[in-house]
């Protein structure tokens, strides 16, 4: 089976082109695409989708029923195409690639800030400003708590990592002492 990224790329590109041509709210499209992706990633839903007795229409009804919000027509049409083409397993990757296209068009990137302790809103805003200067682009920050860091933060932006955690410093000292 081909890589999911390869399967997902044309769907993400088509969704991006259709959304921009129709003047759709891209952040709203990202929201419903990620909601559908989260539903499609559910193991029980995957099991249902693999059942040959379940029709495409039944699967569509289940997914649209599970979706917390009323899906816009574009989302419903997109979901139908994904299901009819048997690409439900690729939907999480489609959503990730679509978000990447939207970020690239807007000149921004997603950044994951990992911290040993909770970060309050004011500190996160200040951190965001300094990280945007450091990385040279607007960042969409999300925070994950990871107590194994001991202290400090670790920031992941795409394939770039800025690690100022105590854990990383201890590992650097250990490597220096062993060498």
Curated annotation (Swiss-Prot):
The entry's keywords: ATP synthesis, Cell inner membrane, Cell membrane, CF(1), Hydrogen ion transport, Ion transport, Membrane, Transport
Keyword field contains Metal-binding: no
Subcellular location, principal: membrane
Gene3D superfamilies, per database record: N-terminal domain of the delta subunit of the F1F0-ATP synthase
An example molecular function term from Gene Ontology annotations: proton-transporting ATP synthase activity, rotational mechanism
Membrane topology: Peripheral membrane protein
Intracellular or extracellular location(s): Cell inner membrane
Source species, domain of life: Bacteria
Gene Ontology annotations for the cellular component aspect, listed alphabetically: plasma membrane; proton-transporting ATP synthase complex
Family that this chain belongs to: Belongs to the ATPase delta chain family.
Subunit structure, as described in the record: F-type ATPases have 2 components, F(1) - the catalytic core - and F(0) - the membrane proton channel. F(1) has five subunits: alpha(3), beta(3), gamma(1), delta(1), epsilon(1). F(0) has three main subunits: a(1), b(2) and c(10-14). The alpha and beta chains form an alternating ring which encloses part of the gamma chain. F(1) is attached to F(0) by a central stalk formed by the gamma and epsilon chains, while a peripheral stalk is formed by the delta and b chains.
PANTHER family in UniProt: ATP SYNTHASE DELTA CHAIN
Alphabetized NCBIfam families for the sequence: ATP_synt_delta, PRK05758.2-2
Name of the protein in its database record: ATP synthase subunit delta
Lineage: Bacteria, Pseudomonadati, Pseudomonadota, Betaproteobacteria, Burkholderiales
Protein encoded by which gene: atpH
């Amino acid at each position: 089976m081909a890589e999911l990224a390869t399967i997902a790329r044309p769907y993400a590109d088509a969704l991006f082109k259709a959304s921009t041509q129709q003047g759709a709210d891209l952040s709203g499209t990202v929201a419903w695409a990620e909601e559908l992706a989260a539903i499609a990633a559910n193991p029980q839903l995957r099991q249902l989708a693999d059942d040959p007795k379940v029709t495409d229409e039944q699967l569509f009804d289940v997914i649209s029923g599970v979706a917390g919000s009323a899906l816009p027509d574009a989302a419903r049409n997109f979901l139908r195409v994904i299901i009819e083409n048997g690409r439900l397993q690729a939907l999480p990757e489609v959503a990730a690639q679509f978000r990447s296209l939207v970020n690239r068009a807007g000149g921004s990137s997603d950044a994951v800030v990992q911290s040993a302790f909770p970060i309050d809103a004011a500190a996160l805003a200040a951190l965001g400003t300094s990280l945007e200067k450091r990385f040279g682009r607007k960042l969409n920050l999300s925070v994950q708590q990871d107590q194994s860091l001991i202290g400090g933060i670790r920031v992941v932006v795409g394939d770039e990592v800025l690690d100022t955690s105590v854990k990383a410093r201890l590992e650097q000292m250990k490597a220096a002492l062993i060498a």
